[in-house]
Amino acid sequence: MPRPPRKRTVEFVPEINYFKPAGVPLRELQEEVLNVDELEAVRLKDIEGLDQQDAAKKMNVSRSTFQLILTNAREKISKALVSGKAIRIEGGIYQVRDCQCGCEQHRHRGGPKSS
């Protein structure tokens, strides 16, 4: 029996979780589902500019697991862009990192939210 998967740690949970090509009705679209932990891997590597080892530590996974998550995420995003599919962001095995920044739901968009 395989061991249960370990939760990946994320710092960012998006408020907007659906993207679609302009001008195409929803009923005609196929979707790619991007897990929250996959989005976090892309964010850490491509936006934050972390190397894979540091990003893996932030997500509480091994470097090889991070590479797999990142590869899967990039493949899904590429398929959606090339094929004109919608992207739905949901699910995955993750936990939100506790922080002391007062950011409300850990959305981490440039620091704490102002009141």
Curated annotation (Swiss-Prot):
SUPFAM superfamilies: Sigma3 and sigma4 domains of RNA polymerase sigma factors
Record Pfam families: DUF134
InterPro entries linked to this entry: RNA_pol_sigma_r3/r4-like, UPF0251, WH-like_DNA-bd_sf
Family membership: Belongs to the UPF0251 family.
HAMAP family recorded: UPF0251
Protein name: UPF0251 protein Nther_2417
